[in-house]
Amino acid sequence: MRVMAIDYGDQRIGIAVSDALCVLCGDAFTMQEWDMARAAKRIAGEVRARGVGTLVLGLPKNMDGSEGPRAELSREFAALLEAETGLKPVLWDERRSSVEAHAILHANGKKMKDHRKTVDAVAATLMLEGYLGTMK
């Protein structure tokens, strides 16, 4: 069963899915959706289509480890995902994932104006790699 990492945002959602052996990121993409319930339904469709057995959802934390309002939205989204998929998402500390994603895109020659299209997928990939690393 594959692992899917999700970087949830108000407008764009980064998604990364492992290979069948749960060793590497097999696919990463960005989904554009403004409605939380519709986003959960769309992701549930991807979960079924791709044979995902584990969900990893980014939990935004402040640098001191405390949780702010964005963390509450992620917890709400986690509940919707669980209702739609039957899988309880693993909440993954995503501190600095977007910063690292921007740095990776910049290092690969992407212009800042083009980051918006892919930064969420890269952030989800970083979370997936981190989670897969704990499975070894």
Task: Set out the residue ranges of the language-model regions.
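Phosphate- and other anionic-substrate recognition elements at nucleic-acid/protein interfaces
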Residues: 2-3, 10-136
